[in-house]
Amino acid sequence: MKNSVRLALVASMAALPLMVPSAQAQQASAMTFFVTSAGSGKGADLGGLEGADRHCQQLAQAAGSNGKTWHAYLSTQGSGAVNAKDRIGKGPWQNAKGDVIASDVTDLHSANNKISKQTAITEKSTPINGRGDTPNTHDILTGSQPDGTAFAAGEDRTCKNWTSSGEGAAMVGHHDRTGLDDSAAAKSWNASHPSRGQGGGCSQDALKGTGGAGLFYCFAAN
């Protein structure tokens, strides 16, 4: 009897390591939203929308999410401008832990969305540093206005449509909904302020200088 109990305990303990990856795989499979755990390494030069989407796809698949089409939440300007809100599907979207951040596009761009430092996590379920952390990386690239639409042509807000790592500027949002004051912009997840820096606001150093790391949001479009 004692031996059978011991064997049962040993068997159950041996199964624990197998259960953890299984649970993680299930979470990754259900994930439809994340913040990239790493940027391109070239500042806001993401290789255009195509390169940004590819980065989302690669990170998601590496985390165990298959069968989904991932798009970066980024707008472009000028001829053929693209609105970020039009390229991310219909929702709902949830993070790798199962927290629903919005039910649809309208909800996402309303005060009701649930994006916060606790929910805007990476594809690996890890948190992103925010204001007060070292280093602060809460500036998330979007190139978008608060309603998810593109800026008019003229003043650069997309680092030359995500192809510049020098001149230009990109609109960023604060994933932790925290800034220098209590203004709506400071608390905006997608339209807080333009990047800036000597020689332009699109280099990796420029993005770091204002509290960023070249990260961006990814959404499952299907």
Protein language model features and the residues they cover:
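Bacterial N-terminal signal peptides that target proteins for export
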Residues: 1-10, 18-22
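Short, functionally important structural connectors and interaction interfaces within domains
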Residues: 10-11, 41
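Secreted/extracellular ectodomain signature
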Residues: 23-222
